[in-house]
Amino acid sequence: NKYLTKYSRLMNIMLRDADKASRSIEQEIEYVTLYLELEKMRFEDKLEYEIQLQPDIDTRKEIPNMLLQTWVENALKHGLRHKDGVGKITIIIKNSTGYTEISVEDNGIGREKAKELGTTGTGQGLKILAEQIEIYNHFNKSKIEIRTLDLSDENRKATGTRFIIFIPDNYNFTSLEN
């Protein structure tokens, strides 16, 4: 069964990396791709995703562990679950001067509508991620920054959410592993 094979691989990666502060972009993409493939099976034809990796990205660069999966899970749970039509998640990883920029965008119902509908969840995933980054930043001169944007059309109707993280080129996770 394809589902069980993918699920088993996902769990193996999660357990292997559970105690790590960071992992490579390549490893994070592998993990989130497995996660999204499993969710596609669940959502059937109502979920699409795209991962855009700028050609000059060094996929060995370290990023916070579970970063992409946390944002993708949040987008699925709050943004896309109640959306009519096909939901889409777009992940873009690119270099900017002095940092790597990673964005996760959904075309969901938006954060305000999700609050109105009372979508289930504790908000713990994003809270834990923010706390982890605060700890990482304590050990680095250059800081990781996170931004959340509410997307809308020309009529100010919500069209999704975009999470963006800026990771400085000289960021060091090594001191956190010891």
Q: Across the structure, where does each feature detected by a protein language model lie?
A:
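Two-component histidine kinase transmitter core
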Residues: 168-173
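Hydrophobic core positions in the C-terminal catalytic ATP-binding module
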Residues: 89, 158-167
